[in-house]
Amino acid sequence: MKIESTRFGTLDVAPEQIIHFPHGIPGFLGEKAFVHLPHDENSPFSFLQSTAEADLSFLLIDPFSFIPEYEFVLSDEMAGELELSEENPPQVFLIGTVREKITDMTVNLLAPIVVNRNKSIGRQIILDKTEYSIRHKLFSEAKASETPEGGK
């Protein structure tokens, strides 16, 4: 299957690589099929590209690479909807936003993306009863001062 992307060009994707979001993603409820594109093999960064809209992709971040204490509880209903189990564990991502400088990047802790890779099902979960922010600065001031301009 060929997918057009303004960011990545033409992608040749196998049907089993497509992650289905039955409820869409808040703000993009009509978009129900995406492909997950790792940045590099061991990178905590990746992308979620719409299969239908060439200009719709999200920067995803592995939260545990930057915020090891990040945690939340999925309801039994949500775990059931995503068909999660010991054999089908969740994969969790945060949507990131890059500002003018990479050191000002923020992530949405309040609405993680939860994916069952084995079943190719995903959902953006909006957490309640939490102090998490939708604009959590990814790099602390200490880490930011160690990162050269341009993020290299």
Swiss-Prot record:
<keyword id="KW-0963">Cytoplasm</keyword>
<dbReference type="GO" id="GO:0006417">
    <property type="term" value="P:regulation of translation"/>
</dbReference>
<comment type="subunit">
    <text>Interacts with translational regulator CsrA and flagellin(s).</text>
</comment>
<dbReference type="Pfam" id="PF02623">
    <property type="entry name" value="FliW"/>
</dbReference>
<keyword id="KW-0810">Translation regulation</keyword>
<comment type="similarity">
    <text>Belongs to the FliW family.</text>
</comment>
<dbReference type="InterPro" id="IPR024046">
    <property type="entry name" value="Flagellar_assmbl_FliW_dom_sf"/>
</dbReference>
<dbReference type="InterPro" id="IPR003775">
    <property type="entry name" value="Flagellar_assembly_factor_FliW"/>
</dbReference>
<dbReference type="GO" id="GO:0005737">
    <property type="term" value="C:cytoplasm"/>
</dbReference>
<protein>
    <recommendedName>
        <fullName>Flagellar assembly factor FliW</fullName>
    </recommendedName>
</protein>
<keyword id="KW-0143">Chaperone</keyword>
<dbReference type="GO" id="GO:0044780">
    <property type="term" value="P:bacterial-type flagellum assembly"/>
</dbReference>
<keyword id="KW-1005">Bacterial flagellum biogenesis</keyword>
<comment type="function">
    <text>Acts as an anti-CsrA protein, binds CsrA and prevents it from repressing translation of its target genes, one of which is flagellin. Binds to flagellin and participates in the assembly of the flagellum.</text>
</comment>
